[in-house]
């Protein structure tokens, strides 16, 4: 769950 969110956050970091 919240996989897309984690991917976006990881990309920003």
Curated annotation (Swiss-Prot):
Predominant localisation class: secreted
Annotated GO CC locations: extracellular region; membrane; other organism cell membrane
Annotated keywords: Antimicrobial, Membrane, Secreted, Target cell membrane, Target membrane
Record keyword Secreted present: yes
Statement: the UniProt record of this protein carries the keyword Signal: no
Entry's localization field: Secreted; Target cell membrane
Tissue and organ expression note: Expressed by the venom gland.
Function: Amphipathic peptide with antimicrobial activity.
Family to which this protein belongs: Belongs to the non-disulfide-bridged peptide (NDBP) superfamily. Short antimicrobial peptide (group 4) family.
Other known facts: Negative results: does not show antiviral activity.
Protein name (database record): Peptide Hp1478
Source organism: Heterometrus petersii
């Amino acid at each position: 769950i919240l996989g897309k969110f984690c991917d976006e956050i990881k990309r920003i970091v």
